[in-house]
Amino acid sequence: CKEVTLTYYERIRILNPHLHAYIFIDEEKGLNWADGIDKLFKCGVDLGPLMGVPIAIKDICSVDGMPTTNGSNIISDDITGPEGSLVKRLKALGCVILGKTHTVEFALGATGLNKYKGTPKNPWDEKIHRIPGGSSSGSGVAVAAGLAAFAIGTDTGGSVRIPASFNGIVGLKTTKNKWPTDGIFPLSPT
Protein backbone atom coordinates (compact mmCIF):
# COMPACT_ATOMS: atom_id res chain seq x y z
CA CYS A 1 0.00 0.00 0.00
CA LYS A 2 2.77 2.43 0.92
CA GLU A 3 4.58 1.82 -2.39
CA VAL A 4 1.40 2.40 -4.39
CA THR A 5 0.60 5.53 -2.38
CA LEU A 6 4.13 6.84 -2.87
CA THR A 7 3.79 6.27 -6.62
CA TYR A 8 0.61 8.37 -6.66
CA TYR A 9 2.30 11.15 -4.68
CA GLU A 10 5.26 11.14 -7.08
CA ARG A 11 2.83 11.50 -9.99
CA ILE A 12 0.96 14.27 -8.15
CA ARG A 13 4.22 16.16 -7.55
CA ILE A 14 4.99 16.02 -11.27
CA LEU A 15 1.55 16.72 -12.78
CA ASN A 16 -0.44 18.70 -10.21
CA PRO A 17 1.51 21.96 -10.67
CA HIS A 18 0.26 21.95 -14.28
CA LEU A 19 -3.17 20.32 -13.86
CA HIS A 20 -4.25 21.86 -10.52
CA ALA A 21 -6.43 18.86 -9.63
CA TYR A 22 -5.55 19.06 -5.93
CA ILE A 23 -5.94 22.11 -3.72
CA PHE A 24 -4.45 20.36 -0.68
CA ILE A 25 -2.10 17.39 -0.36
CA ASP A 26 -0.81 15.85 2.86
CA GLU A 27 1.87 13.40 1.75
CA GLU A 28 3.18 12.72 5.25
CA LYS A 29 -0.25 11.86 6.61
CA GLY A 30 -1.12 9.76 3.56
CA LEU A 31 2.12 7.77 3.72
CA ASN A 32 1.71 7.21 7.47
CA TRP A 33 -1.83 5.95 6.88
CA ALA A 34 -0.60 3.67 4.07
CA ASP A 35 2.13 2.31 6.35
CA GLY A 36 -0.55 1.47 8.91
CA ILE A 37 -2.58 -0.33 6.24
CA ASP A 38 0.51 -2.36 5.27
CA LYS A 39 0.89 -3.41 8.92
CA LEU A 40 -2.74 -4.57 8.96
CA PHE A 41 -2.13 -6.58 5.76
CA LYS A 42 0.89 -8.26 7.38
CA CYS A 43 -1.24 -9.20 10.40
CA GLY A 44 -3.82 -10.83 8.12
CA VAL A 45 -6.46 -8.13 8.56
CA ASP A 46 -8.70 -7.70 5.51
CA LEU A 47 -10.94 -4.62 5.54
CA GLY A 48 -12.37 -5.41 2.11
CA PRO A 49 -11.78 -4.43 -1.52
CA LEU A 50 -11.02 -0.76 -0.83
CA MET A 51 -8.26 -1.52 1.66
CA GLY A 52 -5.13 0.38 0.62
CA VAL A 53 -6.72 2.19 -2.32
CA PRO A 54 -5.42 5.79 -2.69
CA ILE A 55 -8.30 8.24 -3.19
CA ALA A 56 -9.04 11.95 -3.47
CA ILE A 57 -11.81 13.89 -1.71
CA LYS A 58 -13.60 16.95 -3.12
CA ASP A 59 -12.88 20.13 -1.16
CA ILE A 60 -16.44 20.48 0.11
CA CYS A 61 -16.06 17.38 2.29
CA SER A 62 -14.48 17.73 5.71
CA VAL A 63 -11.48 15.51 6.39
CA ASP A 64 -9.88 15.66 9.84
CA GLY A 65 -6.54 17.46 9.67
CA MET A 66 -7.16 18.96 6.22
CA PRO A 67 -8.55 22.42 5.45
CA THR A 68 -11.92 22.75 3.73
CA THR A 69 -12.26 25.88 1.58
CA ASN A 70 -15.40 24.93 -0.37
CA GLY A 71 -13.61 26.52 -3.33
CA SER A 72 -13.94 29.97 -1.79
CA ASN A 73 -11.82 32.64 -0.14
CA ILE A 74 -14.58 33.02 2.47
CA ILE A 75 -13.74 31.09 5.65
CA SER A 76 -16.41 28.40 5.60
CA ASP A 77 -15.16 25.43 7.65
CA ASP A 78 -17.95 26.03 10.17
CA ILE A 79 -20.59 25.62 7.43
CA THR A 80 -19.26 22.23 6.39
CA GLY A 81 -18.77 20.96 9.93
CA PRO A 82 -16.58 18.13 11.21
CA GLU A 83 -15.56 15.04 9.27
CA GLY A 84 -18.70 13.23 8.19
CA SER A 85 -19.85 9.63 8.02
CA LEU A 86 -18.85 9.06 4.38
CA VAL A 87 -15.20 10.00 4.94
CA LYS A 88 -15.15 8.03 8.20
CA ARG A 89 -16.52 4.97 6.36
CA LEU A 90 -13.88 5.27 3.63
CA LYS A 91 -11.15 5.45 6.27
CA ALA A 92 -12.64 2.45 8.12
CA LEU A 93 -12.52 0.50 4.85
CA GLY A 94 -8.79 1.29 4.61
CA CYS A 95 -8.79 3.92 1.86
CA VAL A 96 -5.76 6.22 1.83
CA ILE A 97 -6.79 9.87 1.39
CA LEU A 98 -4.17 11.55 -0.79
CA GLY A 99 -5.65 15.04 -0.50
CA LYS A 100 -8.50 17.37 -1.38
CA THR A 101 -9.45 18.25 -4.97
CA HIS A 102 -10.49 21.58 -6.44
CA THR A 103 -14.13 22.53 -6.82
CA VAL A 104 -15.98 25.56 -8.10
CA GLU A 105 -16.95 28.01 -5.37
CA PHE A 106 -19.46 26.36 -3.04
CA ALA A 107 -19.97 23.59 -5.65
CA LEU A 108 -22.21 25.81 -7.75
CA GLY A 109 -21.22 25.65 -11.41
CA ALA A 110 -21.00 23.20 -14.30
CA THR A 111 -17.87 24.45 -16.11
CA GLY A 112 -15.29 23.82 -13.39
CA LEU A 113 -14.05 27.43 -13.48
CA ASN A 114 -12.95 28.95 -10.17
CA LYS A 115 -11.47 32.45 -10.22
CA TYR A 116 -10.65 32.33 -6.49
CA LYS A 117 -8.85 29.01 -6.01
CA GLY A 118 -7.87 28.18 -9.58
CA THR A 119 -9.32 25.98 -12.29
CA PRO A 120 -8.06 22.46 -12.92
CA LYS A 121 -6.90 21.76 -16.45
CA ASN A 122 -8.53 19.05 -18.50
CA PRO A 123 -5.65 16.56 -18.96
CA TRP A 124 -6.59 15.56 -22.49
CA ASP A 125 -5.28 18.67 -24.24
CA GLU A 126 -1.81 19.99 -23.44
CA LYS A 127 -2.04 22.91 -25.90
CA ILE A 128 -5.43 24.43 -25.13
CA HIS A 129 -6.80 24.94 -21.61
CA ARG A 130 -10.11 23.12 -21.92
CA ILE A 131 -12.63 23.31 -19.11
CA PRO A 132 -12.75 20.27 -16.83
CA GLY A 133 -16.47 20.44 -16.06
CA GLY A 134 -17.80 21.00 -12.59
CA SER A 135 -18.36 21.28 -9.87
CA SER A 136 -16.26 18.20 -9.00
CA SER A 137 -13.62 19.46 -11.45
CA GLY A 138 -10.52 18.45 -9.50
CA SER A 139 -11.92 14.99 -8.79
CA GLY A 140 -12.55 14.39 -12.50
CA VAL A 141 -9.09 15.63 -13.49
CA ALA A 142 -7.37 13.64 -10.71
CA VAL A 143 -8.89 10.35 -11.85
CA ALA A 144 -8.42 11.05 -15.58
CA ALA A 145 -4.74 11.94 -15.06
CA GLY A 146 -4.03 8.96 -12.81
CA LEU A 147 -3.57 11.10 -9.69
CA ALA A 148 -5.98 8.95 -7.65
CA ALA A 149 -7.54 5.51 -8.06
CA PHE A 150 -10.93 7.14 -7.57
CA ALA A 151 -12.27 10.37 -6.16
CA ILE A 152 -15.27 11.47 -4.17
CA GLY A 153 -17.34 14.24 -5.70
CA THR A 154 -20.86 15.51 -5.14
CA ASP A 155 -23.67 15.94 -7.64
CA THR A 156 -26.80 18.08 -7.51
CA GLY A 157 -27.16 19.06 -11.17
CA GLY A 158 -24.38 17.16 -12.92
CA SER A 159 -21.37 17.98 -10.74
CA VAL A 160 -19.96 14.44 -10.96
CA ARG A 161 -21.39 13.46 -14.33
CA ILE A 162 -20.20 16.56 -16.23
CA PRO A 163 -16.51 16.34 -15.17
CA ALA A 164 -16.61 12.60 -15.82
CA SER A 165 -17.88 13.23 -19.34
CA PHE A 166 -15.46 16.08 -20.08
CA ASN A 167 -12.47 14.10 -18.77
CA GLY A 168 -13.34 10.75 -20.33
CA ILE A 169 -13.99 8.77 -17.15
CA VAL A 170 -16.97 7.19 -15.39
CA GLY A 171 -18.92 9.19 -12.82
CA LEU A 172 -21.73 7.88 -10.64
CA LYS A 173 -24.53 9.92 -9.09
CA THR A 174 -26.05 7.69 -6.46
CA THR A 175 -29.67 7.65 -5.38
CA LYS A 176 -30.69 10.39 -2.95
CA ASN A 177 -30.08 9.37 0.68
CA LYS A 178 -27.88 6.43 -0.39
CA TRP A 179 -24.86 8.11 1.25
CA PRO A 180 -24.77 10.33 4.33
CA THR A 181 -24.17 14.02 3.67
CA ASP A 182 -22.97 15.15 7.10
CA GLY A 183 -19.57 16.82 6.86
CA ILE A 184 -20.30 17.92 3.28
CA PHE A 185 -21.12 21.50 2.28
CA PRO A 186 -24.93 21.67 1.98
CA LEU A 187 -25.54 23.07 -1.52
CA SER A 188 -28.73 21.03 -1.85
CA PRO A 189 -30.36 18.09 -0.08
CA THR A 190 -29.88 15.84 -3.15
Predicted regions and their residues:
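Short loop segments at secondary-structure junctions
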Residues: 146, 175-176
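Structural motif
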Residues: 52, 167-169
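Gly/Ser-rich catalytic/binding loops embedded in alpha/beta enzyme cores
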Residues: 1-156
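A short core secondary-structure module
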Residues: 176-190
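Structural signature of FAD isoalloxazine-binding scaffolds in flavoprotein oxidoreductases
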Residues: 161-166
